[in-house]
Amino acid sequence: TLTLTPGQTITLTFTFTMAVSDVTATATVTTTTADNTPTNNVSTAASSANAVADLSVSKVASQPNGNTASSTMSFAIVVVNAGPSTAANVTVSDVVPAGLNVLSVSGNGLGAGNAGNNVSGTISSLASGATATLTIVVSMSNTGSATLGYTNTASVTSTTPDPTPTNNTGTATVTVAPLADVATVVTLPANATAGTVVTGTVSYSNNGTSTAANVTGSVVVGTAGGVITTSGTGNTNTLTLTPGQTITLTFTFTM
């Protein structure tokens, strides 16, 4: 309740939390004194709502550890709109690192696709409180002989302003152990004369997708009655075999 002298103006302030839609405020004034211009006793003002949407993204690996080369696993990317407005033109982007090969991409609430390891998901609008998911299935490689770690980050953007952009990325890390497949083949002449020196060969191969480290091969030459003594400096060799590599060695013995 106020008392206003002739020509006096008093200004008051008020606050409110902006709604998702436009807001209209109406002020009225009355007095017990006769008012000769009652048409200006009501004033209206409008405020347009600028949409904002707090998007966040998280990324989870189905199997962060215990993977081996050539195995498969999946990443789940979850986008949440905490509002308060609908997020327009939402795009999820993920560049899967080399060493992980994208096999398939699918979306729940998102249109999904990929160009090689460049994965994306889009939706024209994501309502406040809504969730959308992008799933990426990958195969894993490791051509070395040590366990590797891969870090993969997904991000989300929208044409609607985001008041909290710090939660617009999500990261998952996975490890991949090497997996080799070593094999050996030994050959001898089909026939040899007793007392002669015979040459044989032994090959060591790696048919796996990872490097085989500290490969030890040996050849024991013998008959049904026992081992024959061979000549040379030894019959054991330590090797490193890269994927697809074959090494062939020779050995001799007296028949």
Language-model region placement:
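Exported/extracytosolic protein signature
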Residues: 1-255
